[in-house]
Amino acid sequence: MKTDFDYNSMPVSFAHCLNGHCLRADKCLRRQVTLRMPKERAAVMVINPEHVTSDGVDCTYFIDEKPVLFARGMKHLLDRVPLADTTVIKRQMIAYFGKTIYYRCCNKERLIKPKEQEYIQGLFRRRGVTETPQFDEYIEYYDLG
């Protein structure tokens, strides 16, 4: 978990975990967020303790507490790509994301997940573009799914 963790950066709907006996509790974001919950927070969403195994080995709600590198913004992503490839890559990204999400990603309104960054890099490679895609900026955040 980041040392400068800000509880208020988590979505209000983020489910907390109360299972302190879980074998993976020290690595689970849901448990770590629960431990850092401010007393001013009157109500939170929690995972039903009866729904998960007590050891947490096969927990479907587990989220790794290590932040990953998200990209933000694609305004200049295609600037150094040949025009013929630009048109094809842009069309493929819109087909992948959908028009609304594509433009939200371009305008820094939505973070671009690591898997999505890999997909875009694959589009570049398939068009013969050897340069690594450069997004507007990068930010460490937790992969919430």
Placement of each model-derived feature along the sequence:
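N-terminal cysteine/histidine-rich coordination modules
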Residues: 1-62
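A short, Lys/Arg-rich alpha-helix, primarily the initiator
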Residues: 63-90, 130-134
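The alpha-helix within a helix-turn-helix
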Residues: 90-94, 121-124
